[in-house]
Amino acid sequence: MAQAKEIVPAPVVVEEAPVQVVEKEVIVYRDREPQGFRPNGYVDLQYRYYGEAEELNYKNNGVSNNYGRTQLMGRINMTENQALEYRIRSYNDWNSSSNDKQKGEDGTQTRLRYFYNHGNVGDSSVNLTSRIEYRKEAESDAQSLEYQARFNFADYLFNNDFVKTTEFTIAPKYKYYWASNSDDYQNRLGVDLFTMHQFPFGFSFEFNLYGDQYFYGQRQYTNDHSTVKNNTGLTMEAYLYNTTNLYTNDKFDIDFYFEGGYDPYNWNSEKVLKTAINEKGDLNDPTNYTYNDNTYEWYAYPQIITTYKVSPNFNVYASLGAEYRNWANINQKSAKDWRWQPTAVIGFKTTF
């Protein structure tokens, strides 16, 4: 009897695959260090033309008043705490300056302001900023230098959907004023109030008070034969602003802009505010003036402003408008002769 053979399976050899070690790049994310302060600011250059105010010409007022004004203004934030503002206005007479019948505005006005932000006072939310201002007037070449300690209490006032206070500053000050005559100088001590409030629908309201105690180096006339050495003055400014967009796209904006109000109202303890009776007469003759203790100017200035965005940091603009103001008589008791004066503006603004 045949026996079955036992079949023994052959051994299976299993080859182990080689182990590969793959090193992956490990990216370590670190917080980016904040960049240091970079100086920034803006530059605005414009030309403004003032047309003849209605009826205020040589025939009716003895002098034409159409002129142009080139204005260069801007701000440089030099450090986190320091800033410089500048405004230079150069007036050019559109008439013949040698002809008294066609005399307009002329000269250059310069204003420079340096700010130093000291931060909040103690643990309060009151900001303290020092401001030094230098100013040179266009007509008389009079100059002034002023220091203010500006305490801003805006964080303690309104901040809701209806009204937001962006500035409420109380500023003690000292000012030194001097003219070409060595005796014609003034020392002024006082306190100013600056406020700004924003409202819905593009409205805002600015209200300012300037309180001054004047100490004159040269006695000031209060009529044709009386003079004073000291005076107390209070000046009020009140402006209403509104900006309403009429059309906009990626490049163009057309806005209706309005501003108006008291610009300014002046009160004095002495009648040192004088107005020439005859602008072509002797301006050094005290009998050629009327003297008042209160004056005011009120105005309204609607405009249409068109802005073209050349780039994110460069805009050009133009506006047409007219200013309504009591040009001829600003005496509080007899203010009158409100007249329209057309204006046109073209300019550009760049930020950096």
Regions found by a protein language model. Give the residues of each.
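Cleavable N-terminal export/targeting peptides
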Residues: 1-42, 79, 311-313, 332, ...
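Short loop/turn motifs that connect adjacent beta-strands in outer-membrane beta-barrel proteins
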Residues: 31-41, 77-83, 119-128, 153-169, ...
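Transmembrane beta-strands of outer-membrane beta-barrel pores
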Residues: 45-57, 76, 80, 88-94, ...
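Residues that define the transmembrane beta-barrel architecture of outer-membrane proteins
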Residues: 64-70, 104-110, 141-149, 183-191, ...
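Outer-membrane beta-barrel architecture
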Residues: 71-75, 111-115, 148-154, 192-196, ...
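Predominantly the C-terminal beta-signal and adjacent terminal strand-loop region
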Residues: 212-231, 238, 261-352
